[in-house]
Amino acid sequence: MVQRKKEGVRDAILEAAFRLFSEQGYSETSIPGIAREAGMSTANVYVYFQSKIDILFQLYSPWLLGRLDKLERAQRRVADPQERLRKLLLTLWRDLPRENNGFTNNVMQAVSTSSGNGDYSPALRQLFQSRVAGWIQECLATPSDESDMLASVALMAFDGFAMNVRLAHSPPCDDDMARLFSRLFAGAAASSAPTP
């Protein structure tokens, strides 16, 4: 017998998971715990989601895509390319990792503990990097392969700031750091530009 999925049940699972991921972190949250929090059986959770990482990405993907759209609109409002790059790095390294009580830290926990059995898809990360590379290319007028490399470095730093957001003595990204790295990125782009 095929079980019919109900949107209200799915939403209850996602709400319960969000609460637990926010309070306990990804590593300390379990499917049975999510089921208890949502007031249902563990088996019922598996009717709606394949795994804990699936639940996490059902929460994280729309949030991240919304933030990237918002960031794109903010980028369009800044005329100066160097200032646009500084604001991009500040958003990536300070603002996004801190939002929702450092919720992005859960993604770092999930990816670092993924078993490699196909439960993690890099599609969202690839989209994220592609959009960041496009913005960097607009700011620095670099070839796409170099913009992609710079975006990769920017996202590795994003990962680090997302992991550190919950540590008591970790230095956060601030305006001075974003300004310094925007100049470093610009210098790297300028040094690789062909000379006339």
Model-found features: residue ranges?
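N-terminal intrinsically disordered/low-complexity leader segments
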Residues: 1-7, 192-196
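Hydrophobic alpha-helical connector segments
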Residues: 58, 72-98, 150-154
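Amphipathic alpha-helical packing segments from all-alpha helical-bundle domains
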Residues: 65-69, 87, 115-142, 148-152, ...
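C-terminal peripheral helix-coil segments that are non-catalytic and often amphipathic
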Residues: 94, 129-141, 152-153, 157, ...
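Amphipathic alpha-helical segments used for helix-helix packing
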Residues: 84, 96-119, 167
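Helix-turn-helix
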Residues: 12, 16-54, 58
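Hydrophobic/aromatic residues within well-ordered alpha-helical segments
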Residues: 52, 59, 63-67, 81, ...
